[in-house]
């Protein structure tokens, strides 16, 4: 059998655009197809799937082949508990160098005092942040007050009292329905709600925007140890100067989760009071989403927290993932480029044009529009659920995700809205003209969904159906867009058949 690599090289002979990265990618697939066919085939299927859908899930993006290749190597075999140059294992010199470079690059990119690049995910980064705050602000002073140097010197009774004090600390953060994340403390099924006493703040029911006066009132009432700011489904920017003042007025630590908009900070779109770095005590983020890196987490902080973050292991982590840290380094270096800054600005320009087009068609968006990379469509006037819209749009090649509204009568599973974002489409090179085309396709699909009642066991459930003519038209328009803006154009899918 002629290998994928051989076919690729034959087809690429004499053509411009062939790269070492694409050659390496095909070589890896060749090996997997021979050694573990089921895995190799699934990777190819996923590539085909991503190349046949408009990826509009706001939390997703496309990483470069360089980022992906940095993950696929023997760095995964190295244990490196500890921090650079202070490991619990020997022979970590190369991993030390990589992690040190990653830390320094993160500090340069975000103009931060210190950085921890070890968290495996955004949820891990958030957990590390809250543990660092409790350790530094509660445990440290308590240990010193008792005349000890370390927590290990406490008696069992003293340690029990310390744990009770830590768990009694108050956290004030955005509710899930108002755009917060499940790790912001207000979802009882999540571990964060079990670490502290958590209280939510919500968007204003009329403006659907966060009300700083109300947040200030709640902060004065609850006196939180931690004030959380950030979002996963909120389409406006935040004023971190105001939030910092609220935190200072009630003696709170300001923790910002910028997982969704880190790339917009790195790219110079969010500046001054919209940039959390000069104002927050601790900032967490993922390294994918708008940063276009590997799946992973990152914590940035003021110098005050540096020694605590350097003890991420054993605070809440064991061994970091050095192969992913290598990929994070690549992505962060890519984000330092002029091209990335242009990309970040285009993401927001595209989102605004997309929102304007939806509004011109008469759809309702939460907050009335967007100032960042995403928006949430209220489907109430169309009489369909977010789950139905998500499924039907997926069937014509458009990937979105259902999203609950601040006052959602349907519930968190089916929801009354869908969330859309522009990071991935912008990575493909699409601009404002394409956003208008995409909006037109989506609106036509949504407005032509018909509901039919189906019996499932003892219950009745609505199911969405789309006339085949409308569905085929949408598929054709999506296909034409993706042919003009292919994912990884240097990789010929014909060679993968």
UniProtKB/Swiss-Prot annotation:
Its Enzyme Commission number(s) read 2.1.2.1
GO MF terms held by the record: glycine hydroxymethyltransferase activity; pyridoxal phosphate binding
GO-annotated biological processes: glycine biosynthetic process from serine; tetrahydrofolate interconversion
The protein's UniProt keywords, in alphabetical order, are: Amino-acid biosynthesis, Cytoplasm, One-carbon metabolism, Pyridoxal phosphate, Transferase
The lineage's top-level taxon is: Bacteria
UniProt keyword NAD present: no
Tell me the residues on which N6-(pyridoxal phosphate)lysine occurs. 289
InterPro entries recorded: PyrdxlP-dep_Trfase, PyrdxlP-dep_Trfase_major, PyrdxlP-dep_Trfase_small, Ser_HO-MeTrfase, Ser_HO-MeTrfase-like, Ser_HO-MeTrfase_PLP_BS, SHMT-like_dom
What is its EC class?
transferase
User: Which pathway does the database say it acts in?
Assistant: One-carbon metabolism; tetrahydrofolate interconversion; Amino-acid biosynthesis; glycine biosynthesis; glycine from L-serine: step 1/1
Instruction: Report quaternary structure and partners.
Output: Homodimer.
Q: Which PANTHER family match?
A: SERINE HYDROXYMETHYLTRANSFERASE, SERINE HYDROXYMETHYLTRANSFERASE 1
- Name of the protein described by the UniProt record: Serine hydroxymethyltransferase
Identify the coding gene.
glyA
């Amino acid at each position: 059998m002629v290998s994928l690599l051989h076919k690729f090289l034959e087809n690429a002979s004499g053509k411009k655009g062939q790269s070492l990265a694409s050659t390496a990618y095909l070589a890896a697939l060749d090996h997997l197809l021979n050694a573990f066919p089921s895995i190799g085939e699934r990777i190819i299927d996923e590539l085909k799937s991503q190349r046949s859908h408009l990826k509009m899930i706001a939390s997703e993006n496309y990483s470069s082949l360089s980022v992906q290749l940095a993950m696929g190597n023997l760095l995964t075999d190295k244990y490196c508990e500890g921090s650079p140059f202070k490991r619990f294992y020997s022979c970590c010199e190369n991993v030390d160098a990589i992690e040190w470079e990653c830390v320094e690059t993160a500090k340069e990119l975000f103009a931060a005092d210190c950085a921890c690049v070890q968290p495996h995910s955004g949820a891990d980064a958030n957990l590390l942040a809250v543990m660092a705050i409790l350790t530094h602000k509660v445990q440290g002073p308590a240990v010193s007050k008792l005349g000890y140097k370390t927590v290990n010197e406490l008696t069992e009774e003293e340690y029990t009292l310390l744990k009770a004090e830590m768990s009694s600390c108050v956290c004030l953060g955005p509710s899930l329905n108002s755009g917060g994340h499940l790790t912001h403390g207000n979802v009882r099924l999540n571990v964060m709600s079990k670490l502290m006493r958590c209280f939510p703040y919500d968007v204003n029911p009329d403006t659907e925007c966060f009300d700083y006066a109300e947040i200030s009132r709640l902060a004065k009432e609850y006196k939180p140890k931690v004030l959380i700011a950030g979002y996963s489904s909120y389409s406006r920017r935040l004023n971190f100067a105001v939030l910092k003042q609220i935190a200072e007025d009630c003696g709170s630590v300001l923790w910002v989760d910028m997982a969704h908009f880190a790339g917009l900070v790195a790219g110079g779109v969010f500046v001054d009071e919209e940039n959390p770095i000069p104002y927050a005590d601790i900032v967490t983020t993922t390294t994918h989403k708008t940063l276009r890196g590997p799946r992973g987490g990152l914590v940035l902080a003021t110098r005050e927290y540096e020694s605590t973050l350097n003890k991420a292991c054993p605070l809440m982590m064991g061994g970091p993932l050095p192969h992913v840290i290598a990929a994070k380094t690549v992505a962060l270096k890519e984000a330092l480029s002029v091209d990335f800054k242009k990309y970040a600005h285009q993401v927001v320009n595209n989102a605004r044009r997309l929102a304007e087009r939806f509004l011109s068609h008469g759809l309702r968006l939460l907050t009335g529009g967007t100032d960042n990379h995403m928006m949430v469509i209220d489907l109430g006037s169309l009489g369909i659920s977010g789950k139905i819209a998500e499924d039907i749009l997926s069937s014509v090649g458009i990937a979105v995700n259902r999203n609950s509204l601040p006052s959602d009568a349907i519930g968190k599973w089916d929801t009354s809205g869908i969330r859309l974002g522009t990071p991935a489409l912008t990575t493909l090179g699409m601009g404002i003209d394409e956003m208008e085309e995409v909006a037109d396709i989506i609106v036509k699909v949504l407005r032509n969904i018909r509901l039919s009642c189906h019996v499932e066991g003892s219950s009745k459930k609505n199911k969405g159906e789309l006339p085949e003519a409308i569905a085929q038209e949408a598929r054709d328009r999506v296909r034409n867009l993706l042919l003009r803006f292919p994912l990884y154009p240097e990789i010929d899918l014909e060679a993968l058949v």
